[in-house]
Amino acid sequence: MIQQESRVRVADNTGAKEILCIRVLGGSSRRYAGIGDVIVATVKDAIPGGNIKKGEVVKAVIVRTTKERRRPDGSYIKFDENAAVLIKADSDPRGTRIFGPVGRELREKKFMKIVSLAPEVL
């Protein structure tokens, strides 16, 4: 569960390493974002020479959370870290590679390009 001021690792090769959540999209009083939800964030740490610069405001979709999430079949899924993938305005990923597994919820929320780039879908 990601909320305002949460720091999230970036799981793609855009050049950003860590982002800070500014807003959870999906309603004026929405507090938390889970796997497959879109947030607005600012870049807090970036590699030199990357496409993304520190201080840039970006949109990102959450791909991993440490808070467990209950699936419709009764099972739970949780990861070791909170991670996100930076996206463009049309919901396509900004990077060309994705690192680490992603949640199956991304397929249900129509982020097919992220699912196809990911090495593993859990």
From Swiss-Prot:
Keywords linked to the UniProt accession: Ribonucleoprotein, Ribosomal protein, RNA-binding, rRNA-binding
Superkingdom of this entry's organism?
Answer: Bacteria
What CDD domains does the record tag this protein with?
Ribosomal_uL14
Pfam families in the record, alphabetically? Answer: Ribosomal_L14
rRNA-binding among the record's keywords?
yes
Q: Which residues cross the membrane?
A: none
Question: Per the record, GO CC terms?
Answer: cytosolic large ribosomal subunit
The record's annotation in SMART domains points to: Ribosomal_L14
Xref: PROSITE patterns: RIBOSOMAL_L14
A GO BP entry is: translation
Q: Which GO terms describe its molecular function?
A: large ribosomal subunit rRNA binding; structural constituent of ribosome
Q: How does it assemble?
A: Part of the 50S ribosomal subunit. Forms a cluster with proteins L3 and L19. In the 70S ribosome, L14 and L19 interact and together make contacts with the 16S rRNA in bridges B5 and B8.
NCBIfam families in the cross-refs: rplN_bact (TIGR01067)
Family the UniProt entry places it in: Belongs to the universal ribosomal protein uL14 family.
- What does the UniProt function comment say about this protein? Binds to 23S rRNA. Forms part of two intersubunit bridges in the 70S ribosome.
- What's the protein name? Large ribosomal subunit protein uL14
